[in-house]
Structures are given as structure tokens and as C-alpha cells.
From Swiss-Prot:
PANTHER family, per database record: ATP SYNTHASE DELTA/EPSILON CHAIN, ATP SYNTHASE EPSILON CHAIN, CHLOROPLASTIC
Gene Ontology biological process terms in this record: proton motive force-driven ATP synthesis
Oligomeric and partner information: F-type ATPases have 2 components, CF(1) - the catalytic core - and CF(0) - the membrane proton channel. CF(1) has five subunits: alpha(3), beta(3), gamma(1), delta(1), epsilon(1). CF(0) has three main subunits: a, b and c.
Membrane topology per record: Peripheral membrane protein
Recorded family membership: Belongs to the ATPase epsilon chain family.
Protein name, per record: ATP synthase epsilon chain
Gene: atpC
This protein's GO CC annotations: plasma membrane; proton-transporting ATP synthase complex
Major subcellular site: membrane
Organism: Staphylococcus aureus (strain NCTC 8325 / PS 47)
InterPro entries: ATP_F1_dsu/esu_C_sf, ATP_synth_F1_dsu/esu, ATP_synth_F1_dsu/esu_N, ATP_synth_F1_esu_C, ATPsynth_dsu/esu_N
Keyword Transmembrane helix listed: no
GO MF, one annotated term: ATP binding
Function as written in the Swiss-Prot or TrEMBL entry: Produces ATP from ADP in the presence of a proton gradient across the membrane.
Taxonomic lineage of the native organism: Bacteria, Bacillati, Bacillota, Bacilli, Bacillales
Amino acid sequence: MNTLNLDIVTPNGSVYNRDNVELVVMQTTAGEIGVMSGHIPTVAALKTGFVKVKFHDGTEYIAVSDGFVEVRKDKVSIIVQTAETAREIDVERAKLAKARAESHLENDDDNTDIHRAERALERANNRLRVAELK
């Protein structure tokens, strides 16, 4: 089976790089997309969600924030603000972030940035979902 290289990049640099990937599944703003070696070149916007990485002897899940994906014949490059494998996610920290975001959303104070709190809640919930996929 032909394989591809997956590289996930954040502002801190490459945080995940793997060769011999058989399938990459991502959530784009237009829906879910699966990519295998030889896929047509594509660029798409990603929404906060997970990346499923299937390789010869297993599957790995990575929580990602909004970003972009570029697909070439044998390479997938994902550019996002944040990315964490399911194993790396600190569940307690994610629960605290969720509680903090929910508290901000419940607060009627005009100083609360509702959009920012909603995004924080979305990211925390995503991290908790992906952590369960270990």
C-alpha cells in the first residue's frame, strides 16, 4: 500500500510528523474528508476537531484547532494554532478550561468576551472528546 507523510504545524513549529501514514481523516468547514496517498491536490479550511491518523499497526487521534490543510500527492500539511495527540492531553487541565469558559458564558458582565469564551469552550470540549479516543 502506498503511504504519505503527515506534518502538523503550529506557530511553535512542527508538532507532529509521521511517515508511512495510510489514511488521514479531518473535519473541514465543508465536512469530513479522508485522504490517502495519491489524493488530488487540495487546500481546505479546518474547523476545531480531530485528525485521525491510520498507519500500518494502529490509529492515533490528534485534537486540533481551526486552521488549514494542504494535500499533495504524498504529503498532508496541516497548519493550526494548537495540536495535541490524545495521549498528550491533560484531562484535568481541559476540564478546568471548560469550567472557566462556562463560567464566563454564564456571567452577564459586559466585559465578558462571549465569542472568545465560546471558542475556549469549544476547544476544551474537543480536547476532552479526543482524550477519550486514546
